[in-house]
Amino acid sequence: MAVSATDLKESRILLYYCFTPIADPTAIMLWQKQLCESLGLTGRILISEHGINGTVGGSLHACKQYARRTREYPGFKGMEFKWSQGGAEDFPRLSVKVRDEIVSFGAPGELKVDENGVIGGGTHLKPEEVNKLVEERGDDVVFFDGRNAMEAEIGRFKNAVVPDVETTHDFIKELESGKYDWMKDKPVVSYCTGGIRCEVLSALMKNRGFEEVYQIDGGIVRYGEKYGDKGLWEGSLYVFDKRMHMEFSEEAKQLGFCKNCGAATNTFHNCENSECREQILLCEDCAADPAVTCGEC
């Protein structure tokens, strides 16, 4: 079949995950590495006994080939791929690794999966079902951010609860702290960038007594594609590539503020201290000043 000029000229980023039992993660890792190298893709792929989690970029043609060939593995047959603007240049290299977890909550033994995905996770809601739940249950609905607190500085669902966590490893301690016990009998909508973190987080929450837990199909990305900035989402979405953030429309609110001068901004920069490199929100003027640091180092 002939390849169109558009497929060769245009580039894309693919985001995907699939929870399914994998008997030999190392074999899958070697196959995925060879496949990506043959197609000229860059990005990051994690594989464990629980499944696969990846973000890759390259030509539109290469991405289409990658999605088709990855779905040939029986466990990945129904895997959904999210397409985004960008390409191989958005990632410094290709990294394909085997890990204990494809999302590092520090609880590999607690997570259970079968061919249908995570066992005991939160109920999946499509974006329109999220809005319907809020229409029906009103302020009783709690949006619970399943990302690092830093990510929520530039975008979040309206009135969301944002846990004080720096990494996903902090969530279990945070959930068990008692701070969120008031939510245990409320409808809780967990959310994250593409949905994968909430597959695990919602199961961890249910295991700890949260009675009515939901998760958004496709995460913030899918909700934003559906409603742009006319729904319940506000601000920019933090992303883990060179773009750093993305917006769903030109009407996106600017929720972040420069840590140095207070000006509105949605862009993170690395601290100028080479031994720190903490990511901090800075406006362009302050980011250009080598004297400005994160204030913690």
From Swiss-Prot:
SUPFAM superfamilies per record: Rhodanese/Cell cycle control phosphatase
InterPro entries, alphabetized: Rhodanese-like_dom (IPR001763), Rhodanese-like_dom_sf (IPR036873), Rhodanese_C (IPR022111), TrhO (IPR020936), TRHO_N (IPR040503)
Reaction catalysis annotation: uridine(34) in tRNA + AH2 + O2 = 5-hydroxyuridine(34) in tRNA + A + H2O
Keywords, sorted A to Z: Oxidoreductase, tRNA processing
Enzyme class, UniProt record, top EC level: oxidoreductase
GO molecular function, one term: oxidoreductase activity, acting on paired donors, with incorporation or reduction of molecular oxygen
Keyword Transcription: no
Gene Ontology biological process terms in this record: tRNA modification
Domain of life: Bacteria
This enzyme's EC code(s): 1.14.-.-
Active-site positions on this chain: C192 (cysteine persulfide intermediate)
Gene3D superfamilies referenced in this protein's UniProt entry, alphabetically: 3.30.70.100, Rhodanese-like domain
Protein's job: Catalyzes oxygen-dependent 5-hydroxyuridine (ho5U) modification at position 34 in tRNAs.
Family indicated by similarity: Belongs to the TrhO family.
Name the UniProt record assigns to this protein: tRNA uridine(34) hydroxylase
